[in-house]
Amino acid sequence: MAVAQADPGSDPAGGARFFCTAGRGLEPFLMREVRARLEATQVEYISGKVFFTTCSDLPSMKKLKSAERLFVLIKKQLPIAVSSLHKGKILNEMQRFVNDDPGSWLEAISLWKKLLEHDPKREKVSQRDANPLKRKAGENETIIAKKLKVEEKQEVAKDHGESQEDKLLQGSPEQGEAVTRTELQDHRLNSTTEKAADAQDQEDLTFRVSCRCTGNVRKVITGQEAGRVIGLALMRQFGWKADLRNPNIEIFMHLSDAYSVVGIPLLRMPLASRTYIQTAGLRSTIAWAMASIAEIKAGALVLDPMCGLGTILVEAAEEWPDVFYMGADMSDAQLLGACDNLKAAGLTDRIELLKSSVTDLPLPSQSTDVIISDIPFGKKFKLGKDIKSILQEMERVLRVGGAMVLLLSEDHHRHLTDCGGSSIPLTSKGHIAEPEMKTLSNPDRTGAPDTASPSQRASSVQCLGRMRPCGSLVPVESFKVSLGKTDAFICKYKKAQASGLSSAECHEPGAHTEMAAMQESPSLQDSL
C-alpha cells in the first residue's frame, strides 16, 4: 500500500484532526490503513469511528478504502450527563459546544475550505441534491427545520440595533438557554481568533445541522431539538445563515452515552461509494478489508470461486494491480453483472470470469495462491454437506502456504467452530486473534486500555483453534463485522503441508503483532 505524499502547499501545518466513520468491526482495518496510507498519528477509535492526525491532502484521504465517510473534526468530548440534568440544563450544555471555544469552529472551517480549494477534483458540497450524511429510517437524526430560518428572522427584527453582547445574553426560555457572564467573557477572549478569520466569508456562510442522538440521550432530547440549539448558537456566534436546501456547509453531530462528536463532512458522497463499481454487490469496504489481509503479492493468482458481481475482485485489482484474478460463478445473471463491472472499471484484461461450480472448479490442484470469497448466507447452500464440499474444493486448488479469506455468516461460522477438533495453537506462544476491538469501559481514564476480563473475552473471542474446517486449512484470524441487518465473520486460513506442517509454523506472527498493536491503540476516551 503506497503512502500518498501531500502537496506541501496544501498540508495542514503540523497535521490536523480528522475522523472517519466505519462499519462496525472494520475499525482495526481502518486504523491500519490510515497509518499506512496517510502516515497518520494519534490514531484513536470508538465504535464506528476512527480519529487520526495527518498532514495528507484531500486527494490522498479520498483513497481510503475501509472508511465510510470522512470529516474534519471540530470537537470530541465526554457525553452530556443526561441522567443528572434537567432538559433546560442539557440544552444549555449543548450551546457550550459553540460558545466555549468558537476558535475551534473557525479553524475547522478554514481547514475545510483549504482542503477543498487544493483538491483538483473539487466537489461542490452545496449542490441542491447533496446529502453528505446518509440517514437510516427509524434513527433519531434530523436537519435543522424550516422553523430555524423563521426564528432567525424574528430574532433579527427583535434585536435590531442591539449589540452582539446583548444578543448573546438573551436566551430563549423555550430552549432552556441561560448564557452566563462567564460565557460572554469566553466570547471576548476568543475575539482575536474570530478577527483572524475572513469576516466576509464567515458572514456569507450558509449551513445546516444534522444531529444524531442515540442511547439515553435519545430518550431526553431529539435530534431536531439538538440541531435547533446548535444552529441558533452558530447564528448568534458567527452570523451564519441557515439554509436547509442548499447550504455551503453541513455540520454533523453525534450525541451518545459514550461521547459527543462534532465534525464537517469533506465529501458529498461517501468514500464507500466507489466510482469504479457500476453495480454494487458485497459492500466495497468489506470486500477491500478481506483482500487487505489475504497477503496478495505481485504475480500471484487470486481466485474468487463464488464471485457474484465481482466486487471482491474489483476491489483487489484496484489496490494490487500486478496480479492475475479469476472469478467463477454458476449464475449467468451474476456473471453478466460482473462483466459490466469489469468493463466499467477497465479491468477486463486482468480479471477472467468463467462459469463453474464452486464444488467442481476446472483448475489443477495447488494452482491458486490466494482465495477470497463471500460464502452465500444459507440461501443457496445448506450447512453441513454443502459447506464441507465447498471448503474441500477450495483446499484442493489452494497451494501450500496460500491464504484463504472467507466471509461467513454467523451460522456458517458457528457450524465450523462446533465441528472443529481440539484446540490448535496459532503461534509459538499459543495466542489467538480477537475478532473485535475493545474500548475503555471507563471514559475518564487515560493511558493504556483496560484489559478485558475473562468473561468479556469468553463472549467476544471465538476460539480460532477449533475452527479447522477441512484437512490442512489452519485458522489465522477472525473479525466479526456488521453487514447492516446481520453480522458476519471475516475468517482467514492458511494451507499447511499435507504431511503435517503445524499450525504454528503455518501462522505468520506478524499479522497478530499488527493486530495486537492496534488493539493497544488508545480509544477516544484516552484523549478526552
Swiss-Prot record:
Keywords: Methyltransferase, Nucleus, RNA-binding, Transferase. Residues 154-168 have a biased composition (Basic and acidic residues). It is an enzyme of class 2 (transferase). Pfam families: UPF0020. Residues 154-200, 437-460 are annotated as: Disordered. It catalyses: guanosine in U6 snRNA + S-adenosyl-L-methionine = N(2)-methylguanosine in U6 snRNA + S-adenosyl-L-homocysteine + H(+). It is found in: Nucleus. One of its GO terms (biological process) is regulation of alternative mRNA splicing, via spliceosome. Signal peptide: none annotated. One of its GO terms (cellular component) is tRNA methyltransferase complex. GO terms for molecular function: RNA binding; U6 snRNA (guanine-N(2))-methyltransferase activity. Its EC number is 2.1.1.-. Residues 162-266 form the THUMP domain. The keyword RNA-binding applies. InterPro entries: RlmKL-like_Mtase (IPR000241), SAM-dependent_MTases_sf (IPR029063), THUMP_dom (IPR004114). The keyword Nucleus applies. Its main location: nucleus. Catalytic subunit of the THUMPD2-TRM112 methyltransferase complex, that specifically mediates the S-adenosyl-L-methionine-dependent N(2)-methylation of guanosine nucleotides, most probably at position 72 (m2G72), in the U6snRNA of the major spliceosome. This modification in the U6 snRNA affects the constitutive splicing efficiency of introns that have suboptimal splice sites and can impact final mRNA levels. Part of the heterodimeric THUMPD2-TRM112 methyltransferase complex; this complex forms an active tRNA methyltransferase, where TRMT112 acts as an activator of the catalytic subunit THUMPD2. Belongs to the methyltransferase superfamily. This is U6 snRNA (guanine-N(2))-methyltransferase THUMPD2. The gene is Thumpd2.
